[in-house]
Amino acid sequence: MKRLCFILFALCMVSCAPYIQVATLNSDTVQLSDKGEFYYENEVARIDYYFNVKENGLFSFSIKNLTAEDIYVDMAKSYFINNGIATDYYGRSTTVTVGKSFSDSYSFGEHVSSTYTTSQSVSETKTAASYVGIPGESARVFTGFMISDTHYTEKGFVEYPYQGYPEVREFNKDESPLVIINRITLIVGGEEIVIENKMYATKYVNALDNVYAGYRPYSENLGNNQFYIIYDY
């Protein structure tokens, strides 16, 4: 099991020093690469997950077709599920065209994981359809899902800890206050393939931004499979 950790929200400014909240997400299926990419992969597709640290944890993901044939996403059977509230993917796709060599880097916004490897131009389109095609060796991005419009709070959890030293809350899988499920139904050669990845928060940390300055901007293995990815606001 990998622990995926990202800056979830900037809390506020106190004496010109920003407080931040860091959320650790665990997943039984999503992996963290050496390059800090959160991804799932099978023989048909690779799914990369992005958390936009500048927009209150805006959630996006890409599906890369690893085959030479077209595959399709069944939008009516694909969902973003945030703490039990389901949102379908209808009208939320953006096309990214990539080449066979996957050699160069393409940045997508301010996301934690933000590179596509491509040797061709990148095109973006919006679409509203029941089925969305992904050509062979291409990728499509789905974006616009908000995890929350505020940081996590609970009674006794200090938002502005003394001198900025970390204030910590930990949870097990069953009691997690944040559970995100990404369910995708692919049509491959006329057959349905359902991919479901769950990510759940197991730790929240409130602290001054500069407390974590030493880890910025790379992911580092701090032991016990804990990965911290820190970005400035």
Regions found by a protein language model. Name each.
Residues 69-77:
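Short, hydrophobic/aromatic beta-strand segments
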Residues 61-70, 82:
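Asparagine-centered strand-capping/turn motif at beta-strand->loop junctions
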Residues 44-56, 60, 66, 169-173:
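Short, solvent-exposed beta-strand/turn "edge" segments of beta-rich domains on protein surfaces
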Residues 143, 147-222:
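Terminal connector regions
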Residues 12-15:
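C-terminal motif of bacterial Sec signal peptides marking the signal peptidase cleavage site
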Residues 17-21:
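Bacterial signal peptide processing site
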Residues 24-48:
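Post-signal peptide N-terminal segment of mature Sec-exported envelope proteins
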Residues 88-167:
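Intrinsically disordered, low-complexity Pro/Gly/Ser/Thr-rich segments with frequent PxxP/GP/PP motifs
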